[in-house]
UniProtKB/Swiss-Prot annotation:
It is an enzyme of class 6 (ligase). It comes from Caulobacter vibrioides (strain NA1000 / CB15N). PANTHER family: GLUTAMYL-TRNA(GLN) AMIDOTRANSFERASE SUBUNIT C, MITOCHONDRIAL. InterPro entries: Asp/Glu-ADT_sf_sub_c, GatC. This is Aspartyl/glutamyl-tRNA(Asn/Gln) amidotransferase subunit C. Allows the formation of correctly charged Asn-tRNA(Asn) or Gln-tRNA(Gln) through the transamidation of misacylated Asp-tRNA(Asn) or Glu-tRNA(Gln) in organisms which lack either or both of asparaginyl-tRNA or glutaminyl-tRNA synthetases. The reaction takes place in the presence of glutamine and ATP through an activated phospho-Asp-tRNA(Asn) or phospho-Glu-tRNA(Gln).
Length: 95
């Protein structure tokens, strides 16, 4: 798939990225290079390869969930800029 300046312009507009006209052609060349690399990756034979979520095959040890009374609320909120009745007070962000 070849990417031209018009495609870069369209993608930039959809992404709401201000792109000067003189940068469209260099960006198209860079994106074409990336697409070539992706096409090379698509040609790699991965049959028989187990999908990986990590290159290190290590898991985390599980522990039993234990219900506790929690920490000292006064001590936890002592560093807060503002707290009321041991609750953090934060600026309102939703009307």
């Amino acid at each position: 798939m070849a990417i031209d300046a018009a495609t870069v312009r369209k993608v930039a507009r959809l992404a709401r990225i201000a792109t000067p006209e003189e940068r469209l052609e260099p960006l198209a060349q860079e994106l074409n290079g990336i697409m070539t690399w992706i096409e090379q990756l698509a040609e790699v034979d991965t049959d028989g390869c187990e999908p990986l979520t990590s290159v290190v095959a290590a898991g985390l040890p599980l522990r039993e969930d234990v219900v506790t009374m929690g920490g000292d609320p006064a001590r936890v909120t002592s560093n807060a800029p503002k707290s009321i009745n041991n609750f953090f007070v934060v600026p309102k962000v939703v009307e």
